[in-house]
């Protein structure tokens, strides 16, 4: 969860700010200012959103989906602190005339044509909401997915612009409401993109996604039907629905499962999970943390009942704010474990809003069991790679600077504090390495306890980019707390890639087993896997082979070669670096570079053996582990990465 994500302004935060401003200045302002304040209050909380996948990889889908959503007021559901003020906010219905979609090639010098893209039936609007000339009355909420034929989009661009064909398209989605200025959102999509790099038996997915079942004034996802379409377009094969414990209930959980059964097929698998807001066991005021709960691999539809046969399938609680307490972390983990499920600590070292008493995970109090000899029951790892952010923008409606008059300074700019690699490395340094070391130290000479790594987009819809309210660092840049800002994170940019040699399972059973056992790697493009081909059949993953998440023991003179396999593409660039890291009870030795064989920079073309003897000098007593990192760089200079989960090994000296 990236707290207080929102896609339109003004928001609930603006309500408070505007009321304070009004109380302070009303007596001194001229009539026109009072009228302006009145109009602001009348429109506060009205929500407009347009979204579309940032990339289209599915050649079998002839459409570009554009999601449009309008909410006339504040949601009155959920158990967040914000929802408590919702019953006091009412407004007149909105009058929707329709929606226009305009398209152009990228570049600020090219402007949108005056004529919108018209679908079958003609008229003056891409979508006409009127009936017999009368606008559509929207009392509370309205959603629509416009399916734009990609062939028609290409024809439209050829008609209006020279220099095609265009694989990257800028879009303006214009919502027309009576009495309102046009509500324009600017998007960018890449069409006809190639498939993602693949390796046999490995499936990309998002372990942390919020659907429309996350629905409050600060954070909203998209319906499952269009989420499936967007997931396939971006190259994902499975998605865990990690909607918030502050909003889920047994009825919504059951409804989600009903939808999942209708949508799951061989192309995409949904798994019903939950992001739980919990209270850390450490002392202090800022103690709210999050975890992603995943169901039992043997019964993915069971949920997290406190006892067999119970109808309480979800773990419900507050958001952690004053007067709205969250569930204790240990109680949540105990219930997850009792139901046969497991959990990852979600963004454990990223800040959560102080409004929600947000804190970070504590190694001793939260990760470790009371005796320190393992992780807390139910916990298998952490998710420090969260949100694929490299740049941010103050302009949340046009972060790409698509309009000619956009301020470049307000468009996407590098942001070192938000950079996902910076946050990932911090999470590895603060959490993963110390916990891995602890596992080796506490369990010697027994096999160490495992600590696994995962990644998730934490997208709330966010098919194109993420528009959010900054409720964490709002004092340093107040405009982002009031007006919002954008990040380039998007659904499909990050993936946990799991090994499922027998397929994903109709309900995701094999995906869950791989996540529980660490048979997974983390990637935002290239793939690198490593293991030991013990049956010497030239493949990794046969019965008896050692894969990521596995354990093995050998005499020092009998260590088999470590087999590597990788795949990248022109989009992500050739492998620039393969780094092998060996960990012991004394910590991790410095990363050692493994040369990439000439001619195999894009694809390993089978297994590549690595003699480990020169790398394993540190492993002369007790258990240790091996993990790898790969980095690529494309022609545009963009860097992409892949991280493997460890293989735990014990080397004995005769």
Give each language-model segment a name.
Residues 14-22:
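Bacterial N-terminal signal peptides
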């Amino acid at each position: 969860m990236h707290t207080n994500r929102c896609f339109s302004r003004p928001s609930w935060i603006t309500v408070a700010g505007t009321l304070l401003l009004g109380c302070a200045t009303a007596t001194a302002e001229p009539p026109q200012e009072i009228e302006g304040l009145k109009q602001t209050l009348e429109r506060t909380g009205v929500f407009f959103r347009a979204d579309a996948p940032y990339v289209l990889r599915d050649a079998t889908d002839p459409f570009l989906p554009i999601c449009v959503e309008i909410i006339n007021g504040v949601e009155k559901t959920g158990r967040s602190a914000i929802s408590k003020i919702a019953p006091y906010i009412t407004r007149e219905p909105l009058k929707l005339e329709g929606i226009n979609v305009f398209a152009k090639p990228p570049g600020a010098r090219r402007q949108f044509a005056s004529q919108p893209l018209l679908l079958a039936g003609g008229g003056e609007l891409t979508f006409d909401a009127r009936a017999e000339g009368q606008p559509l009355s929207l009392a509370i909420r309205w959603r629509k997915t416009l399916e734009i034929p990609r062939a028609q989009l290409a024809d439209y661009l050829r008609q209006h612009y020279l220099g095609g064909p265009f694989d990257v398209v800028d879009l303006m989605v214009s919502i027309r409401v009576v009495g309102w200025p046009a509500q324009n959102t600017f998007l960018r999509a890449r069409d006809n993109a190639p498939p993602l790099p693949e390796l046999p038996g490995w499936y990309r997915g998002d372990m942390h996604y919020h659907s429309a079942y996350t629905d409050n004034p600060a954070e909203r996802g998209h319906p499952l039907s269009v989420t499936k379409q967007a997931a396939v377009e971006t190259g994902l094969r499975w998605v865990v629905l990690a909607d918030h414990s502050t909003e889920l209930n047994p009825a919504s959980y059951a409804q989600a499962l009903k939808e999942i059964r209708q949508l799951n097929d061989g192309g995409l698998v949904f798994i019903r999970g939950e992001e739980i807001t919990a209270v850390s066991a450490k002392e202090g005021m800022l103690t709210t943390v999050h975890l992603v709960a995943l169901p039992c691999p043997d019964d993915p539809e069971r949920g997290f009942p406190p006892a067999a046969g119970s109808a309480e399938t979800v773990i419900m609680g507050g958001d952690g704010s004053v007067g709205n307490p969250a569930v204790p972390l240990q109680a949540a983990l105990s219930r997850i474990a009792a139901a046969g499920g497991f959990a990852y600590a979600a963004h454990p070292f990223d800040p959560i809003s102080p409004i929600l008493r947000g804190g970070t995970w504590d190694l001793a109090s939260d990760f470790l069991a009371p005796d320190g000899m393992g992780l807390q029951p139910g916990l298998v790892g952490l998710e420090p790679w969260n949100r694929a952010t490299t740049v941010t923008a103050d302009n949340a409606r046009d972060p790409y600077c698509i309009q000619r008059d956009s301020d470049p300074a307000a468009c996407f700019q590098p942001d070192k504090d938000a950079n996902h690699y910076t946050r990932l490395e911090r999470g590895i340094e603060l959490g993963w390495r110390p916990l891995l070391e602890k596992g080796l130290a506490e369990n010697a000479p027994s096999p160490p306890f495992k600590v696994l790594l995962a990644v998730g987009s934490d997208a709330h819809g966010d098919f194109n980019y993420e528009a959010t309210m900054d409720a964490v660092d709002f004092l340093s840049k107040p405009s982002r707390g009031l007006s919002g800002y954008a990040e380039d994170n998007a659904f499909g940019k990050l993936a946990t890639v799991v090994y499922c040699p027998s397929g994903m399972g109709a309900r995701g059973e094999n995906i869950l087993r791989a996540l529980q056992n660490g048979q997974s790697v983390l990637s935002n493009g290239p793939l690198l896997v490593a293991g030991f081909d013990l049956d010497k059949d030239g493949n990794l993953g046969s019965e008896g082979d050692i894969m990521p998440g596995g354990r093995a023991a050998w005499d020092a003179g009998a260590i088999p070669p470590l087999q590597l396999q990788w795949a990248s593409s022109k989009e992500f660039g050739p492998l620039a670096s393969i780094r092998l890291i060996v960990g012991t009870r004394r910590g991790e030795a410095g990363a050692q570079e493994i040369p990439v064989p000439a001619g195999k920079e894009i694809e390993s073309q089978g297994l590549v053996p690595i003699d480990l003897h020169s790398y394993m000098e540190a492993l002369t007593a007790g258990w240790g582990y091996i993990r790898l990192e790969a980095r690529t760089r494309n022609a545009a200079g963009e860097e992409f990465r892949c991280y493997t989960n460890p293989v735990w090994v014990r080397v004995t000296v005769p």
